[in-house]
């Protein structure tokens, strides 16, 4: 593994793995416990329209993606309040709308733009730039600081919104801000993980940790550790087997989840 780090692109990829393992499983834990695990898929699909606008208009896809995702995050919370008993309706509406808009925008662009969109669809952790790695560490710092400062309020909000409301917490504002932070994180992860697989890195490590952890904090720590080890293993395998890194990482997480689920079932 150390020999791989002699390459500059592998050094950047390894740093990106460290950054993503610090924040994506933390957000994933909240998403799962809030029964919003599909939100990561929804916002990643919506982000494609932001990428499309950026490529067609000739501006930074990252900037346009963040702008679109922030709007979608607010709208998603509105839909969640409208369809309280059917929250998946809001995610379905936004997901399909995001894909439709991206296809329409790209159809009006050049063929080279379509090729660039494919890079954002599947991502490539080994081709990300130093600026993109830095942006991942910035969002990691933001997520960790916010988690440290607002862990108790988010804990109450996650498990019982009614109690959070009675305690005087700004439930709607907190939910919107959480959606927005998650959206920005997804937008910054897309160049490395790809829009189609970004939810894997966010949700699967947290899903595995929930099978092993004994309390809320231990689940978060386990999720980050599992996320880091799984991504490093996927990076290592993809280099030697010559497979896409994001796909290799996904297979590893799914395999670990299935193995742990089977072991726990037989133990019981």
Each model region followed by its residue ranges:
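Membrane-interfacial amphipathic/re-entrant helices at transmembrane-helix boundaries
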Residues: 1-22
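Transmembrane helix-bundle core of multi-pass membrane transporters
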Residues: 10-12, 91-150
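Hydrophobic alpha-helical transmembrane segments
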Residues: 14-19, 62-67, 90-93, 133-138, ...
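Short loop segments and helix-boundary regions at transmembrane helix junctions
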Residues: 29-112, 209-221, 240-241, 265-266
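Small-residue-rich segments of transmembrane alpha-helices in multi-pass membrane proteins
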Residues: 46-56, 94-105, 123, 127, ...
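Membrane-helix/interface signature in polytopic inner-membrane proteins
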Residues: 145-178
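Transmembrane alpha-helical segments in multi-pass inner-membrane proteins
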Residues: 192, 198-247
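Cytosolic-side transmembrane-helix boundaries in multi-pass membrane proteins
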Residues: 246-268
């Amino acid at each position: 593994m150390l020999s791989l780090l002699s390459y500059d692109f592998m050094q950047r990829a390894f740093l990106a793995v460290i950054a993503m393992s610090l924040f994506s499983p933390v957000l994933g834990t909240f998403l799962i416990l809030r029964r919003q695990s599909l939100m990561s898929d929804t916002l990643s699909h919506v982000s494609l329209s932001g990428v499309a606008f950026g490529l067609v208009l000739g501006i930074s896809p990252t900037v346009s993606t963040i702008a679109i995702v922030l709007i979608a995050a607010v709208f998603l919370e509105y839909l969640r309040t409208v369809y309280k008993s059917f929250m998946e309706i809001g995610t379905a509406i936004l997901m399909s709308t995001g894909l439709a808009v991206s296809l329409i925008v790209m159809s009006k662009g050049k063929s080279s733009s379509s090729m660039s969109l494919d890079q954002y669809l599947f991502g490539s952790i080994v081709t990300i730039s130093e600026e993109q790695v830095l942006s991942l560490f910035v969002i990691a710092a933001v997520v960790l600081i916010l988690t440290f400062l607002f862990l108790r309020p988010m804990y109450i909000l996650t498990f019982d919104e009614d109690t959070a409301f009675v305690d005087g917490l700004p439930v709607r504002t907190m939910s919107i801000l959480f959606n927005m932070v998650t959206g920005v994180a997804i937008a910054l992860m897309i160049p490395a993980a790809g829009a189609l697989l970004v939810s894997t890195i966010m949700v699967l490590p947290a899903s595995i940790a929930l099978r092993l952890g004994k309390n809320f904090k231990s689940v978060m720590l386990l999720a980050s550790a599992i996320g880091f080890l799984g991504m490093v293993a996927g990076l290592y395998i993809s280099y030697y087997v010559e497979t896409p890194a994001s796909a290799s990482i996904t297979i590893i997480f799914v395999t670990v989840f299935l193995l742990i689920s089977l072991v726990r079932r037989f133990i019981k």
